[in-house]
């Protein structure tokens, strides 16, 4: 089983504790995602002007891009309470009913991993979202009866990394749908500089830029790398982070300029050395790496594919010429492109 990686996009307990201190509270402080910010500003102002609860919001995208942070920002901008829960926690319809009946008018209910709600819970959520009512069964057997409970108008914010797993009836009940994209190095540099200032870290702009460009387009990873570089600088550089210190810290962490760690490089090397660059089936690759198939598909592959180092074809995984160059190797000229792989037309 893969140990926790420094450049993993999933949250650790340390991340959650640190996020509380550096999390932006207003849209003006929420860096990046400009189209999403512009749209949400309009929706929030319109809802406040009408004195209504804002329409329900679905936020999706890869982990670590700020879905939870955006939900906090929305609640703060609306000036209402935020109740936070997650799909796996809501096991029974009664759990959801308890949450909904304790909301105040216009409050925001945030459900993380909303794709993991059970079908029974979803059935309760539908009328709550549409009509602000829930039907609850009282009693058992022949004496059982259904009662209808009115709810205060509220805004549901659902977050998911896997929007494709949402059922169509649930997805269709969200009036606002926002996709968060990977951040540019310039946006991440601004985030690192802001976080460093809040945490009291002495970090130069070029040091922040070096951290940002290795953060895989993800603020959570950028902030985690900043904390690790801070540790390095505190011991080796009197607490000062500049370009040279950031590079030395990244070398210690084995995070290269592309944001790859040893596991990423090992996967690319395995395909090149053991399978002649591919194609190779995911099961064979997992066995060669002594990793689970799910780890390859959900943890390692996405960023390699997004950056153009790896492709999935009908016959399996293949590395691209870009991967050969990154490993310091010369791409073979006699390998024909597979289906789905970019190649010369002539």
From Swiss-Prot:
Residues reported in the UniProt entry to bind ATP: 22-23, 64, 67-69, 130-132, 173, 183, 220
Keyword hit for DNA-binding: yes
Function field: The RuvA-RuvB-RuvC complex processes Holliday junction (HJ) DNA during genetic recombination and DNA repair, while the RuvA-RuvB complex plays an important role in the rescue of blocked DNA replication forks via replication fork reversal (RFR). RuvA specifically binds to HJ cruciform DNA, conferring on it an open structure. The RuvB hexamer acts as an ATP-dependent pump, pulling dsDNA into and through the RuvAB complex. RuvB forms 2 homohexamers on either side of HJ DNA bound by 1 or 2 RuvA tetramers; 4 subunits per hexamer contact DNA at a time.
Compartments where found: Cytoplasm
Region (Disordered): 1-20
Designated name of the protein: Holliday junction branch migration complex subunit RuvB
GO biological process: DNA recombination; DNA repair
Catalytic activity: ATP + H2O = ADP + phosphate + H(+)
Listed EC numbers: 3.6.4.-
CC annotations in GO: cytoplasm; Holliday junction resolvase complex
Underlying gene: ruvB
